[in-house]
Amino acid sequence: MNTPSNKTNHYKLLFICLGNICRSPAADAVIHRLVESKELSHKFSIDSAGIGNWHVGDLPDRRMREHGAKRGYNINHIARQFNKVTDFDASDYIIVMDDDNYSEICVQAKNARQRSKVVKMKDFFSRHKGETSVPDPYYGDAKDFEFALDLIE
């Protein structure tokens, strides 16, 4: 595990998906609640971003907000695009949802130190060890949104 980029043991997590309207804002909300429930909010900064700019300024997809709300999550992050100039240096971990996200973010890294911050969400799966990614539910149905949340949790 990388050490925090500062001396206060404060970890900065950045979740990445394609458009920042489904998976990464859901991960942001899930991890926020987990950290709060463990009374560790003072040790984490959590954010999310998208690779593309299509949805910048938008709320998360309505379906993800609805499915998240059924589980008690407030998925309300305003979409933004990943910024290689600031986000690599501002983050201790950049957690991507799938292999395409991983490749795209790693290509933007200017050195090995930045690349070492990029990890896959699947590396944290405890109940779904056979899964290789968090599939994008955007073109799917209700079960796809539920499955994405299952994996993220």
Question: What does each model-found stretch correspond to?
Answer:
Residues 2-91:
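Conserved active-site segments centered on acidic
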